[in-house]
């Protein structure tokens, strides 16, 4: 797993936290050439929108952990979690040695969590009925398919009574609510051992503005986490691109509050997308009393300013060091190159008229990678999967993929000792 350790920032930078808007949307401030190259190649995806959603699963090395193998009715992993985010959390916790072995009960909070894959992973790893796991996500009252609520989680919630759903003061589960922010701070301030934030949108129709569109939700998740985090605790946050000043500011803020902050992309995250994770370990503050007013002020300004002619530009009112910026450019170069290569490979596969043999080889290789991943993280897997020659559809057809990793099932294949906890590499 590729990962970068960010430079530490002075701990009193919280005094410079602010919400700053400008009249125009700002251009990228780092890695400009990479930004525009990604912009161009992502636009090529639009040409093959239908085919892309199929063939991206062939070029993703770890797709078949949770996705049905072509011409088969099963995937590599026997375990069927609430969502494929379960596998990402298993991988992140193990690789970064997030402590899940405490003999004392722990408290965890999971922001933008529906349908519950991150909580499910922690519940499995801990296997403690005296822990408290709290999930908060936007409540969907209109059956919006783009809002991953708790609909699939009924069986899981019934089996795990120590998983609590928090809907906030207004009952909406909306993180971008000032009332909910104040309420969560009063209820859970400085008390959480482990926090996750997995917020996102359906970006399929707007790849190019992912980073900007995520800004407010990203910052909202961060201020919630900082207010709730217990001293010594850990936080895992999903991010996307990092070209804009506001994203850089958020990473700098996190680097000032934690001993170690990493940026990484799990193997179970599709290589052709912009998704990455920030892993923060060792929270430095004993309470939030000193920094809460600064977070409240900036968050209040952000959620109350709905002027469509104004654009968020900064969350810090001071410049950052050249060293910090250069490290982010280094990480952009590595992750960006990997993403470009996988997008290019997928588009080339789509355009290839004689793709059957190539697809067959990809599937065979990727199945073995998925099996090795399951072995590494002690996840039960189907070890009698075979792919016969000439089992694929003609190149003029499109394979039929169906997901089973996004539906909840009973976990009879898991033994008490198959927890998914292994020593990191």
Pin down the residues of each PLM region.
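Intrinsically disordered, low-complexity glycine/charged-rich regulatory or linker segments
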Residues: 1-187, 311-415
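Gly-rich Lys/Arg/Thr-decorated short loops/hinges at beta-loop-alpha junctions or inter-strand turns
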Residues: 68-73, 197-210
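Beta-strand cores of modular interaction/reader domains in eukaryotic scaffold and signaling proteins
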Residues: 107-112, 132-135, 196, 234-238, ...
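Conserved beta-strand elements of beta-rich interaction domains across eukaryotes
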Residues: 113-118, 138-141, 200-202, 241-242, ...
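A short acidic (Asp/Glu
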Residues: 117-123, 144-149, 206-208, 245-251, ...
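A short acidic, Gly/Pro-enriched loop at the edge of an enzyme's catalytic core
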Residues: 180-196, 203
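Conserved Class I SAM-dependent methyltransferase catalytic core
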Residues: 208-263
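Class I S-adenosyl-L-methionine
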Residues: 249-305
